[in-house]
Amino acid sequence: MTVYNINLGIGWASSGVEYAQAYRAKIFREMGQEAKFVFMDLILGDNIEHMTSKIGFSDDEIIWLHNYFTDIKIAPSTISLAEIETILPANPERKEVAGRLIRYHYPQDDMVVACNLRAMDEDAVETVSYFVNDKLLRKDFYSYTRYCSEYSAPKDNQAKVYQRRFYNEDGSTAYDMIVGDNNQDIYRFPDQVLYGKQEFLRYFFKR
């Protein structure tokens, strides 16, 4: 039997609730009781693994709702800058380093690609953002592979996300999330379409 613990989100400044859950995970481990800790929020500000491992969860104890429908494991960001450079457009005119942010400039295409490292003293890349004419068009999220892409379009002088794509390990699309207003997102799977977060949650709990 597996014990499932349902949570909403997690952040770097975790509340007592998350620490209590991590303590509960430790107790379950000592008892030999299998347990999973489910996080329901869309968590893309940072790789969820970096936050859950920081307070004591094991990676195999974590289920993240939006990752659950893929075959990508919960894991730290380990893909290197050198690996990312192999998939970027060739021959940038200039490479600019500013702390954790590495920018590649392609003025011939009015494009800048910005790689955000996990930490100042690490080579692991967390996100890669693509700007054209100073407008954010796409942002890719990485652990040991790309697990999500976020597509944006300019609106009211800001980048408005209109679609998120979640991937499998082989790079194929697991499902698309079409971003709507008032939490009316559409989740498009190969075999069905779900309308709104409530249908998405029901589909998850049926699995």
Regions found by a protein language model. Give the residues of each.
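Long terminal segments
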Residues: M1-P76, S80-E83, Q163, Y167-R207
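Repetitive, compositionally biased segments used for assembly/scaffolding
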Residues: T86-Q198
